[in-house]
Amino acid sequence: MRSIRPIPRSALPDMMTVRAPLPDGTYDEPELICNVRFERTQKVSDDEHRSADADGGTVFVDAVNSVGAFEVEAGSRVAVGGRSMYVIEVRRCEDLLGRVHHWEIEVR
């Protein structure tokens, strides 16, 4: 049985810096992950003004083609395209053999 192919590098045009949280409430030195993909999301809030929130999105990190890839911790600060964001959730996506294929990192 073959595993799932990596996300092609041509689909991973962005770079991301990651600053993991430290126990004292500060953040560690930034670590760079190259060849990631950031897709913005826009949500409408259910307030009286129907305001839209376009600051968040999902970062895709491939286990093979993202240089410097590692499992980013929820609560970390990341920067993609000059925008600093907070990691809300990290989804580990595995292939059929249980190996990490990629991570989907929800940021806001």
Residue spans of the language-model regions?
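Active-site-proximal polar cores
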Residues: M1-D28
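Short, conserved turn/kink motifs that form compact alpha/beta structural patches or helix kinks used as
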Residues: L22-R108
